[in-house]
């Protein structure tokens, strides 16, 4: 339905393409249709609109999903994973998927009031960007999502959230490896 179409939209690709006639997949070395490239090559407006849309892509289905599904049920796992998977692997579209980092943050924020997973992800991104600086960005993202998943598995008691976060980490790590092999 409409949700399937929405989660597969690469807003960070389409917004700069529509507003500035820029294909952000052809300019940067990583060819990633991500929010950081929308900011860098499309400017502030393209970047902020992309950020809002990509966060919403993950937030809306998870936030609404927990209103109608029991988050303790394994049926909640696909609700967590679908926006990230749809961004990383946008079937039936000519564009290559993105790393799904921003969509992952949206999913985790959608777990409100349970924000520990989102805080873990933000903490490790900041830690590996400011305290122990890891470059290139793809390696930073791989380590961040690895530590994020490990901490969720250790501290979050809800199995569906543990499994969903683990699968999200695997998807993003795989996507980062795809982009570094280009």
Give the ranges of each region predicted by the language model.
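Helix-coil boundary and interhelical linker segments in multi-pass alpha-helical membrane proteins
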Residues: 62-78, 110-118, 154-164
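Multi-pass membrane catalytic core of lipid/isoprenoid biosynthesis enzymes
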Residues: 34, 39-66
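Conserved small/polar residues in nucleotide/adenosyl-binding loops
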Residues: 1-9, 179-182
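Interfacial segments of multi-pass membrane proteins
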Residues: 42, 65, 101-134, 147-155
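Cytosolic, membrane-interface loops and tails of multi-pass inner-membrane proteins
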Residues: 14-44, 181
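Transmembrane alpha-helix interface/packing and boundary motifs in multi-pass membrane proteins
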Residues: 4-9, 84-94, 130-135
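Short, non-helical or kinked segments that cap or interrupt transmembrane helices
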Residues: 24-31, 91-105, 136-147
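Loop-to-transmembrane alpha-helix initiation sites
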Residues: 116-123, 138-145, 156-169
